[in-house]
Amino acid sequence: MSRIPFIYCILSAFLSAACSFRAPEEHDDASVDIIPGLEIPEFADNEDIVAHLGYTASYNHRTLVPDWVAWELTAEEANGQLNDQYPFSRDPSVNFPKASREDYSNTGWDKGHMAPRADMKWSSQALEESYYFTNVCPQDHEMNSQAWEQIERLSRLAARHYGSVYIVCGPVFTEGRYGTIGRAQVHVPDMFYKALLTHTGKGYQTVGFIMKNQPECSQPVNYAVSVDSIEALIGRNLFPQLPDEQAEATYEMKYWTK
């Protein structure tokens, strides 16, 4: 899968500039080199990459959902206190075709955040942009409000504990069993994945999760897999800049259940 050197450099520059808005974390390990855009997965030259203040996404104009959404969550951001409510809306920075609120109306599917609003409560702009449909997929309500949300909480706890966590998640299409919704024909995913990366002070640690788009209410450990397993499923390198490839091959839940 080819990369876009020029776009990737611009994206890294954007992310580096965005970091200037974030205060240094007391958890930071001075021995760890900061790698701008470490959360950004490998992407192809035909992907529509959108960089917002709190997350970066690849929007798919065929499925009308993001292929992936990636963000770094710091300890300070995980403690954000803003609680403004915004309507879901079309992302003005992407071209048509794109999903709208009407496509989800009366379908029985949640407008499921990929980068959760609770991770964006450190900035009004980041919070508002989390409601763009470039960050939304149709999700089963029980899964979205229970098992998926538990993994979101786990991510915030890890960010507070280690200082920051790099996160990438997105939909998985296998059988297409749920078809499409709305006039625009938004594709409903069969599953979702989420991959987490952090530095513990002693080395990089990762964990992945794969969850079916159906009622799910179990504990995160029951959905845990290696990042390599997710990459094999979706055919994408999730952390191409990670210096330690071995960290993707295994996972230990003890690093994620503090």
Locations of regions flagged by a protein language model:
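Domain-level detector for secreted/extracellular nuclease and nuclease-toxin modules, and
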Residues: 17-258
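Bacterial N-terminal signal peptides
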Residues: 8-16
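Bacterial N-terminal signal peptides that target proteins for export
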Residues: 1-7
